[in-house]
């Protein structure tokens, strides 16, 4: 899940963590397999998935780009950057589906905290609810009241949310003091 956010680094004093993120988005498909997990990004279909993968020792990376691809570095910069402070990669798009294990529902505060770990580094976060039918009150409250209050300058937007999720998010945003 952290790969999909960007700004992933083990040495923040010397490295921004944007390199692998920008490279991934230049390719049409990317697949990384390691320690029994496989993460796949498909820019054409606009989705990412995590599945069980090979348990072979080591890490494998497969990257494909079509000769007719329209991915450019400028397009990647434009999509994941705001005009605030002329920063590059200060906007994250996070597929909510990556926070789930198997087909579990997203109900708890701990699931929301896992999804939003390290997102305070950005100016803008777009949460993609594609494929998510239901979230719990606590999950929504942790993101749209607790996290938002801790980071008031961070803009959080939602896409691909169904009516249930839109109503729940709206309720938390408008009546946050009534939720706990």
Regions found by a protein language model. Name each.
Residues 45, 66, 75-77, 162:
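Regulatory and interdomain segments flanking nucleotide-handling catalytic cores
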């Amino acid at each position: 899940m952290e790969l999909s956010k960007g700004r992933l680094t083990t040495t923040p004093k010397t490295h921004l963590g944007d390199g692998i993120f920008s490279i991934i988005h230049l390719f049409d498909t990317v697949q990384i397999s390691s320690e029994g997990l496989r993460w796949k990004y498909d820019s054409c279909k606009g989705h990412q998935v995590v599945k069980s993968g090979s348990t072979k020792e080591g890490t494998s990376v497969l990257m494909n780009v079509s000769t007719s691809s329209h991915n450019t570095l400028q397009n990647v910069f434009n999509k994941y950057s705001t005009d605030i402070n002329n920063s590059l990669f200060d906007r994250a798009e996070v597929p909510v589906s990556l926070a789930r294990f198997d087909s579990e529902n997203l109900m708890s505060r701990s699931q929301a905290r896992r999804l939003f770990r390290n997102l305070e580094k950005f100016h803008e976060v777009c949460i993609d609810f594609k494929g998510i039918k239901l979230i719990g009150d606590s999950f929504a409250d942790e993101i749209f009241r607790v996290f938002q209050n801790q980071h008031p300058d961070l803009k959080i937007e939602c896409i691909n949310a169904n009516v249930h999720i839109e109503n729940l998010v709206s309720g938390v945003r408008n009546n946050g003091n009534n939720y706990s």
